[in-house]
């Protein structure tokens, strides 16, 4: 009986290890006003060896366009998967949880599926009366 239990446990741990190995790492870098001014986008003047190496090893988006003229609503769109016309988040002073209290953001979705999420900088535009979105990280 104990041998069967140990065999089942080892088998289950083996399957868990295989599943964990199949989950890709995700590093999402958001930069305001970057334009394609990096070597990996063909800029001969920009010296961006680290970003170029990340682009070679990972995924580079060639047709990712800003959907709002203001940075905060554009990031809200990316984090929510919904345009400003749907969310009502148009300006720098927009408050995510006031407009969409039950919203599930991209970081929340990743966390729900076993990822560790972190944020550095103004992903949810801290300032202009905003405090970020602690629920997302």
Predicted regions and their residues:
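Formylglycine-dependent sulfatase
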Residues: 2-4, 18-137
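Bacterial N-terminal signal peptides
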Residues: 4-16
């Amino acid at each position: 009986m104990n041998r069967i239990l140990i065999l089942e446990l080892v088998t289950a741990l083996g399957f868990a290890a295989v599943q964990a190995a199949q989950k890709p790492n995700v590093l999402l870098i958001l930069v305001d006003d970057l334009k394609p001014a990096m070597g990996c986008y063909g800029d001969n003047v920009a010296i961006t060896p680290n970003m170029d190496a990340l682009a070679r090893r990972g995924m580079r988006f060639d047709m990712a366009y800003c959907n709002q003229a203001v940075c905060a609503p554009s990031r809200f769109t990316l984090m929510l998967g919904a345009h400003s016309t749907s969310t009502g988040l148009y300006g720098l002073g927009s408050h995510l949880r006031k407009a969409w209290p039950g919203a599930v953001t991209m970081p929340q979705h990743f966390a729900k599926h076993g990822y560790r999420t972190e944020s550095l900088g103004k992903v949810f535009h801290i300032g202009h009366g905003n405090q970020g979105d602690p629920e997302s990280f």
